């Protein structure tokens, strides 16, 4: 089973396309939607829904994927639910990047500090990071600097922030999903 979390643009038709692409790895792809506007509520909602999907799914190699803001959530929720994560162009500092887009972006800071101390150290090698060299929204070099100590970084030379085409990375994701 693969759980897919959209980014800030939850209504983008690209989300459906990504789900279809991920079905080449596993036919059981679950799209879990969340508001993007209420971080504390989103955290509770995503924890509940992902945990329920994992319990019902019966796949010992479940995986959670997210793009942009979905990458922020996939890394944390996947860690808390004990499943591997694949994050594309993750928004690692939504409290900064969401200024002016949502009412209380500072809630992201609260979530980041309250998650689990040193969670990336505890999550070491359980997350695969795919970064675009052409991300027009986030500084992918900074993301690589923050994450390379903990996770494998895969660079993409073609995609932009929304990462419309996952195809070149599907075999790598499939191999990562099936690791013991």
Swiss-Prot record:
It holds the Pfam family UPF0227. The lineage of its organism: Bacteria, Pseudomonadati, Pseudomonadota, Gammaproteobacteria, Enterobacterales. Belongs to the UPF0227 family. This is UPF0227 protein Spro_1925. Coiled coil: none annotated. InterPro entries: AB_hydrolase_fold, UPF0227, UPF0227/Esterase_YqiA. It comes from Serratia proteamaculans (strain 568).
């Amino acid at each position: 089973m693969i759980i897919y979390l959209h980014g800030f643009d939850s209504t983008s038709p690209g989300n459906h396309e990504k789900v279809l692409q991920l079905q080449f790895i596993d036919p059981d792809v679950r799209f879990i939607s969340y508001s993007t506007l209420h971080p504390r509520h989103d955290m509770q909602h995503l924890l509940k829904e992902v945990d329920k999907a994992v319990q019902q799914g019966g796949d010992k190699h479940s995986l959670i994927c997210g793009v942009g803001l979905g990458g922020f959530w996939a890394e944390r929720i996947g860690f808390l639910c004990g499943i591997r994560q694949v994050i594309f162009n993750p928004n690692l500092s939504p409290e900064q990047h969401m200024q002016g887009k949502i009412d209380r972006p500072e809630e992201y800071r609260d979530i980041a500090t309250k998650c689990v101390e040193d969670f990336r150290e505890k999550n070491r090698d359980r997350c695969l990071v795919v970064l675009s060299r052409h991300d027009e929204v986030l500084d992918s070099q900074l993301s690589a600097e923050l994450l390379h100590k903990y996770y494998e970084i895969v660079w993409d030379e073609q995609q932009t922030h929304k990462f419309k085409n996952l195809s070149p990375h599907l075999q790598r994701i499939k191999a990562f999903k099936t690791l013991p």
